[in-house]
Amino acid sequence: MLEGIIRESISKSAVKALRNDGYLIANIYGKGQENTHCAFKKNDFIRAVKSKTNIIFPVKVGGKEINVVVQEYQKDPITSDLLHVDLMLVQPGVETKFLVPVKTAGSAKGLKNKGVLILSKKRVKVKCSPENLPASYELDVSDLDVGDAILVRDLPELPNVKVIEKESVAIVGVIKAK
């Protein structure tokens, strides 16, 4: 489990000192909860996020174990190092917006006809409670030929999960290679 420390000071100099010690600055917030300013070891955080099987993962901060989801992160534009991450507290029964990953399965027919598979949306925004949150959307692309696409409206409908995207937006498609 990922363990972090609570930041006593939120000043610029304290943030610089933590970053120089290899920490990633983070904020944990939730509906009706007080914000928690904390820091995680950068390499431990990256390892934990890459190895998680679900969008929701547990962290331990200040002796308390809480379930969170990565809401937003900031990267250095030059070095691509993580600078800051916002973690949202997952509260049972509270409907929240999540970004659910999209995964493709199969090999598209259009690839044999000189086509290229393009994944336009890697994540789809949904609104639901954490209990109903899907781990990912699995899309079968084996029937896609050149010029075909799977749109948001073609996603499987899940109970108590509302997709908050325009229905005409393409998620994955096969285009003709030049």
Curated annotation (Swiss-Prot):
Annotated InterPro entries: Rbsml_bL25/Gln-tRNA_synth_N, Ribosomal_bL25/Gln-tRNA_synth, Ribosomal_bL25_b-dom, Ribosomal_bL25_C, Ribosomal_bL25_long, Ribosomal_L25_dom, Ribosomal_uL5_bac-type
Taxonomy, superkingdom: Bacteria
Protein name per UniProt: Large ribosomal subunit protein bL25
Subunit structure: Part of the 50S ribosomal subunit; part of the 5S rRNA/L5/L18/L25 subcomplex. Contacts the 5S rRNA. Binds to the 5S rRNA independently of L5 and L18.
Annotated family: Belongs to the bacterial ribosomal protein bL25 family. CTC subfamily.
SUPFAM superfamilies the UniProt entry points to: Ribosomal protein L25-like
Protein purpose: This is one of the proteins that binds to the 5S RNA in the ribosome where it forms part of the central protuberance.
UniProt-listed GO biological process terms: translation
GO molecular function: 5S rRNA binding; structural constituent of ribosome
Gene3D superfamilies, sorted: Ribosomal protein L25, beta domain, Ribosomal Protein L25, Chain P
GO CC annotations on file: cytosolic large ribosomal subunit
A family per Pfam: Ribosomal_TL5_C
Keywords assigned by UniProt, alphabetized: Ribonucleoprotein, Ribosomal protein, RNA-binding, rRNA-binding
HAMAP family tied to this protein: Ribosomal_bL25_CTC
Keyword Ribonucleoprotein on entry: yes
